[in-house]
Amino acid sequence: MFKESATLDFHYNKIDEAALAFFRSIVGDEFVLTTGEHYEKYAKDETENLRFYPEAVAKPNTTAQVSALVRYCNEHKIPVYPRAAGTGLSANSLAIYGGLMITIERLNKIIEIDENNLQVTTEPGVITELLQNTVKEKGLFYPPDPSSRGTSFIGGNISCNSGGPRAVKYGVVKDYVLNLEVVLPNGEVMWTGANVLKNSTGYNFTHLFVGSEGTLGIVTKIVLKLIPHPKFNVIMLVPFTSMDQASAAVSAIFRAGITPSCLEFMERDAIDWVCNWLGDVTIPIADDVRANLLIELDGNDMDYIQKEAEHLYEVLTQFDCGEILFADSDAQKNDLWRMRRNVANAVKTTSVTIEEDTVVPRFYLPELLRHIKEVGKKYNFRSVCYGHAGDGNVHVRIIKDELSDNYWKNEVPNGVREIFEKVVALGGTISGEHGIGWVQRRFMDIKFPEFQMELMRGVKKVFDPNNIMNPGKVF
């Protein structure tokens, strides 16, 4: 069973006037917040119905400023919470124990695009989509594209090792991070690696920090690998009469030697909700359709893409699918992507919800989806399933509806545990890209025996013996 974090064994000091004076001397009076409407947003992220207020928020704009703030907090036993754009879904950056929140929003410059080496050096507060569009102007491509790419920061993506739809072909954030400048919990500054494509020199600190959710340090500069931007793509929406058929088709597509650049799953309710919410997207969906796959093929040779699309069509006809909608214009392509990327926004406007981030080997998707619906019936909750079927990553949006607060708080988590137990039994894990944060810690025992949790705590202790860096997260 879940073992409560050792965080509570640490004594933390409150931020006093002397500390506030020091913070202001480092970043300036206007960049230290303790009250006001602008301060309010730092108490929450996209995890619903949670509020944890930091005692102060600091907004540095240099590595030296971050280092000075962290060093002071370490010396005075004040907890530090690194914050990106606040798009996290697991309370990843919330100030569980008060202390100082350090936001990276002013570390927002793209420093250099190296077209010769296909690299970009950036600060962590750059919006993901802005970085993608900027390098695209040079004919270059940074593929990881979480649904929050229009608001999330690159630094936050690194914190959770984000993926997104294109991960199925191009990989996740860790596959593009070459080097990181990091402020350690004692205030020291280090580069984790080198700006090279191969590095077998000592332990891989770069990959250790990617996905560490701000528990080991604060990233202040990032070197990313880029690739040439593909010139063409074909996008199609494929309807199925059952979730079983749609999810079974996923594995068959890859077994046929086809590697889509995106392969997304949406059950029928997801599409109905999002189309109603958007209002201006009209996608014809037959009454008997229960699920859809959104599939993209891309590359630099349109003839080859069309042949691959024909091969894909042959595979799909082995399943109970309806008429395939091929997007025949950029506007229609954009509509299909708007529909997929806004499912979560649409569903959560109807009720309080929680979103789980399951991932299994893709052949087992049908079994997982059946189990999710069975658990929902057992615990009397509705759910909407959608996500990155191509790499087995299904998001489960559980809807509170009219459930009592007590039942939602105390019984629904038992259903979530049953879902995660099935996920792990199928060879999967409890988070593919959202991270563990604060809200998912209670499920870590499903995946990891206690000795492995102790190894993680040991790594944390080496970097952060005073446990000031994002305490209360992961374990």
Regions found by a protein language model. Give the residues of each.
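N-terminal flexible segment immediately upstream of the FAD-binding catalytic core
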Residues: 1-71, 87-118, 147, 270-282, ...
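Alpha-helix capping/hinge segments and adjacent helical runs
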Residues: 29, 424-436, 465-469
